[in-house]
Amino acid sequence: MFITNILLKKAKSKNILVLMESAVSGHQFTMIRERLADKLELQRFDPYIQKMCLYRERKRLRSLN
């Protein structure tokens, strides 16, 4: 590996955009979290069933600056 590749390499961003999905209805939304944090699980209002339900992180979408 050349030394120029190491010097010109960009640093990884601190935050990433992730896709959250409802465990009940499949409703999805995006959320920002830190790269080093654990996968997200949270309770939030689901507009499809009109109740609070569990949302889990499904996948990473992209990194943010």
Curated annotation (Swiss-Prot):
Gene source species: Anopheles gambiae
Similarity comment text for this entry: Belongs to the bacterial ribosomal protein bL33 family.
A single GO cellular-component term on record: mitochondrial large ribosomal subunit
A GO term for molecular function: structural constituent of ribosome
Protein name: Large ribosomal subunit protein bL33m
Assigned keywords, A-Z: Mitochondrion, Ribonucleoprotein, Ribosomal protein, Transit peptide
Domain of life: Eukaryota
Encoding gene per record: mRpL33
Transcription regulation keyword on record: no
InterPro entries in the cross-refs: Mitoribosomal_protein_bL33, Ribosomal_bL33, Ribosomal_bL33_sf, Ribosomal_zn-bd
Location(s), subcellular: Mitochondrion
Subunit structure: Component of the mitochondrial ribosome large subunit (39S) which comprises a 16S rRNA and about 50 distinct proteins.
PANTHER family reported for this sequence: 39S RIBOSOMAL PROTEIN L33, MITOCHONDRIAL, LARGE RIBOSOMAL SUBUNIT PROTEIN BL33M
Primary location group: mitochondrion
GO biological process, alphabetically ordered: translation
